[in-house]
């Protein structure tokens, strides 16, 4: 039972809204079934450790 779907704690349900709640859940399930285009919006600042790692790797490759 989940309160956001009009269900109440203790098993009590609002009978008038119960049909609406199930329709809402059905729509959400349909949306989840559709493929989602996700794209990363987090841009990490350059890490000094990553830069150092790159320098060390290039030095090792030169040897």
From Swiss-Prot:
Cell location: Secreted
UniProt superkingdom: Eukaryota
The organism's taxonomic lineage, starting at the top: Eukaryota, Metazoa, Chordata, Craniata, Vertebrata
Record-linked InterPro entries: GnRH, Gonadoliberin, Gonadoliberin_I_precursor
PANTHER family: GONADOLIBERIN, PROGONADOLIBERIN-1
Protein name: Progonadoliberin-1
PROSITE patterns: GNRH (PS00473)
Disulfide bridge partners, by residue number: none
């Amino acid at each position: 039972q989940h309160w956001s779907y009009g269900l109440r704690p203790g098993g009590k349900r609002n009978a008038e809204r119960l049909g609406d709640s199930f329709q809402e859940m059905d729509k959400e399930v349909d949306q989840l079934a559709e493929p989602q285009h996700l794209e990363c919006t987090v841009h990490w600042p350059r890490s000094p450790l990553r830069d150092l790692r790159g320098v060390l790797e290039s030095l090792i490759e030169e040897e």
